[in-house]
């Protein structure tokens, strides 16, 4: 029996041990490759594990090199060119508060605010009034539910606050979403035309401050969920097809900050802290 064990058992055991060691070596090799960047901090090995896209610093075409007068630039010497660039540099930040309208009647043509929607707007207006922020201006969508929301908010803010209306920020499909929505699918022509309008609104409203602006601004834009979500993606240089993955409550606040050099950050997305649980809706 012992001789049989020696004859057959030992080779089998050796194979098992050898296989285990081989598997262990393979695992170690895999782990070494997976965590190689912890041992080697060269840019190549690090970036292989963390591929990153480039930030477009001139995303709004308001970098000084885009604003400078080309005819003056061609005639200027090095000192003159430096001066021209300095004159085109932004020095202030823009704080943009993207406000979604209150709850509205889905089954009515004009889609007026519901009683709850009006309460939401009142609570939002009080919060903005008590925020100690001196708002610079307000732009509102021309759609009924947004205009009604804006007018309720304005009752709580200084009467001399500059305000304007824009049809560019009306609701619409900004970009074909990924993944597709199960039940909502506008026709291709609607995407084609409405996406162009909403992109036009983004280019007009979302950009760094002009060189002439010397103080930080605090601007209110009262509009719609699709528009706001698209603006977020575009401003942060996220894929625009991801806009539908976010959900914004009625009368929520999304606070966008654009710095002088074009850097963008989000202070809050869909903030509804001014609403009690029984006042929250997402229609």
Curated annotation (Swiss-Prot):
Superkingdom of the source species: Eukaryota
TM stretches of this protein: 7-23
Keyword hit for Membrane: yes
UniProt membrane topology term: Single-pass membrane protein
Catalytic reaction(s) noted: O-phospho-L-seryl-[protein] + H2O = L-seryl-[protein] + phosphate; O-phospho-L-threonyl-[protein] + H2O = L-threonyl-[protein] + phosphate
InterPro entries, per database record: His_Pase_superF_clade-1, His_PPase_superfam, Mito_Ser/Thr_phosphatase
UniProt subcellular location: Mitochondrion outer membrane
GO cellular component terms, A-Z: mitochondrial outer membrane; mitochondrion
Pfam families, per the entry: His_Phos_1 (PF00300)
Broad class of where this protein is predominantly found: mitochondrion
EC number: 3.1.3.16
Keywords of the record: Hydrolase, Membrane, Mitochondrion, Mitochondrion outer membrane, Transmembrane, Transmembrane helix
Gene Ontology terms, MF aspect: phosphoprotein phosphatase activity; protein serine/threonine phosphatase activity
Quaternary structure, from the entry: Interacts with skn-1.
Protein name: Serine/threonine-protein phosphatase Pgam5, mitochondrial
């Amino acid at each position: 029996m012992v001789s049989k064990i020696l004859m057959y058992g030992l080779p089998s055991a050796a194979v098992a041990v050898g296989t285990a060691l081989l598997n262990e070596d393979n695992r170690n090799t895999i782990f070494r490759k997976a965590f190689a960047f912890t041992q080697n901090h060269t840019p190549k090995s690090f970036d292989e594990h963390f591929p990153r896209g480039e930030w477009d610093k001139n995303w709004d075409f308001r970098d000084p090199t885009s604003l400078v007068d080309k005819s003056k630039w061609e005639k200027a010497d090095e000192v003159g060119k430096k001066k021209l660039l300095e004159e085109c540099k932004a020095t202030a930040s823009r704080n943009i508060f993207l406000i979604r309208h209150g709850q509205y009647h889905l089954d009515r043509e004009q889609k007026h605010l519901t009683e709850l929607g009006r309460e939401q707007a009142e609570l939002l207006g009080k919060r903005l009034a008590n925020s100690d922020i001196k708002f610079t201006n307000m732009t509102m969508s021309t759609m009924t539910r947004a205009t009604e929301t804006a007018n309720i908010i304005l009752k709580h803010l200084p009467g001399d606050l500059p305000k304007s209306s824009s049809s560019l920020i009306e609701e619409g499909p900004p970009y074909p979403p990924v993944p597709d929505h199960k039940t909502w699918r506008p026709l291709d022509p609607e995407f084609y035309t409405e996406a162009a309008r909403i992109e036009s609104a983004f280019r007009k409203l979302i950009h760094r401050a002009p060189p002439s602006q010397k103080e930080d601004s605090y601007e209110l834009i009262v509009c719609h969920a699709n528009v706001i979500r698209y603006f977020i993606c575009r401003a942060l240089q996220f894929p625009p097809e991801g806009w539908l993955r976010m959900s914004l409550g009625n009368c929520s606040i999304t606070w966008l900050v654009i710095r002088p050099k074009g850097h963008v950050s989000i202070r809050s997305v869909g903030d509804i802290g001014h609403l009690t649980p029984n006042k929250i809706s997402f229609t």
